[in-house]
């Protein structure tokens, strides 16, 4: 059964107020979020080969360039360590890989040996991230929390304990490098992150104004929609926190 948000978490997500500085942590999933591993047959060897040569989601280069320039970044993947390293080498340059403040894999999910080697449902516990990681991309101390942490992932179930820190993107599926579907999600995530960058409580923002792609609408229309969400957020926070 998927974990549920704690009462404390839900309470803290209900207020516009939160962190005292603007530093934010972006946690990245890999497969299905930033890339696709096209597999005809699933085996240890085929998964590794697909990890070495994944199909990048459209807009990935610009997305990575933006987040590394503006946020502290870590990876949290349910894949095995050697596959995670293969995917990172395929999509990130050396500077970006070195800039990661952490890279968590299946090893960090507290699985039994039986579970580790099988395709079982896994969960990404952000409480563990907040307990163990206490520095930003420059090495300075910071208290990461629900106020300043954003996870970009295609699985709502894996992020069920912290739904209002989750930018839920659709599962990216592509058949081959020559057959990549049109996809605007990462471009839209950049716009959403630009709005989240300076808010004091990202969990309030995501709770009240969750990320959403308008189906069958253009990139321009979707960016306009996300800007309208931000305007609505600003109006609500002015009501919650009237200026003297």
Swiss-Prot record:
<dbReference type="InterPro" id="IPR036412">
    <property type="entry name" value="HAD-like_sf"/>
</dbReference>
<dbReference type="GO" id="GO:0004721">
    <property type="term" value="F:phosphoprotein phosphatase activity"/>
</dbReference>
<feature type="domain" description="FCP1 homology">
    <location>
        <begin position="19"/>
        <end position="196"/>
    </location>
</feature>
<dbReference type="Pfam" id="PF03031">
    <property type="entry name" value="NIF"/>
</dbReference>
<dbReference type="GO" id="GO:0005634">
    <property type="term" value="C:nucleus"/>
</dbReference>
<dbReference type="GO" id="GO:0023052">
    <property type="term" value="P:signaling"/>
</dbReference>
<dbReference type="InterPro" id="IPR004274">
    <property type="entry name" value="FCP1_dom"/>
</dbReference>
<protein>
    <recommendedName>
        <fullName>Uncharacterized FCP1 homology domain-containing protein C1271.03c</fullName>
    </recommendedName>
</protein>
<dbReference type="InterPro" id="IPR023214">
    <property type="entry name" value="HAD_sf"/>
</dbReference>
<dbReference type="GO" id="GO:0005829">
    <property type="term" value="C:cytosol"/>
</dbReference>
<dbReference type="InterPro" id="IPR050365">
    <property type="entry name" value="TIM50"/>
</dbReference>
<dbReference type="GO" id="GO:0005730">
    <property type="term" value="C:nucleolus"/>
</dbReference>
